[in-house]
Regions:
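Active-site or metal-binding loop neighborhoods of secreted/extracellular toxin and effector enzymes
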Residues: 150-152, 160
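N-terminal structural segment of carbohydrate-active enzymes
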Residues: 1-117, 125-127, 131-136, 140-150, ...
């Protein structure tokens, strides 16, 4: 189930509308009654899509969540597969943004009380272009913090790079913002696009994670097993 759609009863959504205009389902909408009805359908598990915090055009700076440039967010709500913080949950889904993790824990608890198991998307292939964790545990290094972007591939990097090339996507890089999105050097796009010019049909809102596989030289694996 697409979590942000379940429970959103707005019948007057507008094209390209924001969360104020179009609304958003919440984790709290999965009440014990709702989950019980899902259980009656014969379900044994419920797959909550879009739980992990992902890129969005909703402004949460008042909660110390860094904003995302609109040019690299698909739609206002963003793609649930453009993960922005592996250690946090999507604030759009919470009634109380500062308490969003507790709301998620309560959702898991209600689901289990209803006799259902929980599945959520992990999305290990790629992350949002502006990935930044404000919830990572102490002692954890930010993705890409120790990368050497002078190498298109290094087994010690978290990302793949297009050295000495600025990202020049084949679409509007401002999308209404005061300044265009800037990325230098450009990083490889999530759908294995190893150049600096992704187009609108690519997963342009994401950057590919490097697990030690050198895609540019025959797919040589530098770790065994591959992480």
């Amino acid at each position: 189930v697409f979590t942000r759609l379940f429970g959103n009863n707005n019948n007057h959504c507008v094209y390209n509308g924001d969360i104020t205009a179009n609304g958003c389902g919440k984790m709290a909408d999965f009440t014990l009654k709702a989950l019980g009805e899902i259980k009656k359908l014969g379900a044994t598990h419920i797959w909550y899509t879009g739980i992990i915090e992902h890129a969005t055009q909703t402004d949460y700076r008042r909660y110390n969540i860094s904003p995302d440039h609109p040019a690299i967010v698909k739609g206002k709500a963003g793609s649930p597969y453009a993960i922005k913080d592996y250690y946090d949950v999507d604030p759009d889904l919470a009634n109380d943004v500062p308490g969003r993790m507790k709301e998620f824990e309560n959702l898991v608890h209600r689901t289990h009380r209803s006799g259902l198991k929980v599945i959520i998307d992990f999305v290990p292939n790629h992350v949002a272009r502006q990935y930044h964790s404000d919830a990572q545990p102490d002692g954890t290094t930010e993705l890409g913090a120790n990368d050497d972007p002078n190498y298109s591939f290094s087994p010690y990097n978290n990302f793949y790079y297009i050295p000495q090339a600025e990202l020049r996507a084949q679409f509007d890089m401002k999308e209404g913002a005061a300044e265009p999105y800037h990325e230098y050097p450009a990083k490889a796009t999530g759908n294995n696009r190893f150049d600096a010019t992704p187009n609108i049909n690519d997963w342009y809102e994401t950057i590919k994670l490097n697990y030690g596989v050198d895609y540019l030289n025959g797919g040589t694996c530098h770790f065994s097993p591959t992480p």
